C-alpha cells in the first residue's frame, strides 16, 4: 500500500531564522521631504512647522542617527521577527548616542582595506585606563584621502565589535583582521585625547628623569669604586 508523503514542519530553530532585509532609510527620508514640500505648496499646514521638520530631516544629526541605525541593523546579531530586530537595533542606537552624551554624536566611517593599510594610528586602551583613540592620520594615506576620520576620534567599534573598555591589542587585531573594507563607529572628542596625551607626556617625562637619576647614581658609584681599585693595586 502506498503511504501518503508527509512534509515535516519546520523546527523551532528554522522558524527563528530571518533574512535581514536591506534598509531604505535614505529613500524614506527623501520621500518624506518630498511630501513635506507638497504639503507646503497646498497651504494646509503652517509653513514654519513644515520648514522646521524639513530642517530636522536634513540635519547632520539626523543623518548620523540614520547611519548608526543602519550600521547597527546590519551588524547586530539577533534571531526573531523583523519587529524584534527593529527594537533591538533601536535600543543599540540609543545606547550609542547615550554613551556619547556631552560629546560629538557617533559617526559611521567605512574605509577600504588595501595593501597600504588604513592610514591611521591608534593609542590608548584598557591597560592605559583610557579609551582607544585615533591619534594620527597618516598624510597621503587611505584615511586622509577618504576624509571621514579625524585625529581625536574615539573608536567605539570595528566591524560591529565593540572596543569600548577593551585592550589596545584587541582593537589592533580587529583592524588587521578586516578584509576588503572596515566599518568604524567613532565619535569626535579631541579634548579628551589632548588630556590623555598630556598625561602620557607626564609619564614619559617622569620616566626619563628616573632613568637620568639612575644613570647619575651608576656614574657616582663607578667613580667611588675607581680610587679603591687604584689603592688596592
Curated annotation (Swiss-Prot):
**Where would I look for the motif Kinase interacting site in this sequence?**
14-28
Which GO molecular function entries does the Swiss-Prot or TrEMBL record give? Answer: L27 domain binding
Give the GO cellular component terms, alphabetically: basolateral plasma membrane; bicellular tight junction; membrane; postsynaptic density membrane; presynapse; transport vesicle membrane
This protein's record includes keyword Transport: yes
User: Topology relative to the membrane, per the entry?
Assistant: Peripheral membrane protein
Segments of this protein annotated with the region Disordered? 214-233
Q: Tell me which domain of life the UniProt entry assigns to the organism this sequence originates from.
A: Eukaryota
CDD domains listed in its UniProt record: PDZ_Lin-7-like
Tell me the Gene Ontology biological-process terms attached to this UniProt entry: exocytosis; inner ear development; neurotransmitter secretion; protein transport; synaptic vesicle transport
Q: Domain PDZ spans what residues? A: 108-190
**Record-linked InterPro entries:** L27_C, L27_dom, L27_dom_sf, LIN7, MAM_complex_regulator, PDZ, PDZ_sf
Q: List the disulfide bonds.
A: none
Give the matching PROSITE patterns: L27 (PS51022), PDZ (PS50106)
Q: Which SUPFAM superfamilies match?
A: L27 domain, PDZ domain-like
Q: In this record, what's one Pfam family?
A: L27
User: Where is it made, tissue-wise?
Assistant: Expressed in the kidney, along the length of the nephron.
Where is the protein found, in the record's own terms? Answer: Cell membrane; Basolateral cell membrane; Cell junction; Postsynaptic density membrane
Could you list this entry's UniProt keywords, alphabetically sorted. Cell junction, Cell membrane, Exocytosis, Membrane, Postsynaptic cell membrane, Protein transport, Synapse, Tight junction, Transport
Q: What is known of its domains?
A: The kinase interacting site is required for proper delivery of ERBB2 to the basolateral membrane. The PDZ domain regulates endocytosis and recycling of the receptor at the membrane.
| Family to which the UniProt record says this protein belongs | Belongs to the lin-7 family.
Q: Quaternary structure per UniProt?
A: Forms a complex with CASK and CASKIN1. Component of the brain-specific heterotrimeric complex (LIN-10-LIN-2-LIN-7 complex) composed of at least APBA1, CASK, and LIN7, which associates with the motor protein KIF17 to transport vesicles along microtubules. Can also interact with other modular proteins containing protein-protein interaction domains like PALS1, PALS2, MPP7, DLG1, DLG2 and DLG3 through its L27 domain. Interacts with DLG4, GRIN2B and MARCHF11 as well as CDH1 and CTNNB1, the channels KCNJ12/Kir2.2, KCNJ4/Kir2.3 and probably KCNJ2/Kir2.1 and SLC6A12/BGT-1 via its PDZ domain.
Q: What is this protein called?
A: Protein lin-7 homolog A
Q: Which organism's genome codes for this protein?
A: Mus musculus
The gene that this protein is the product of is Lin7a
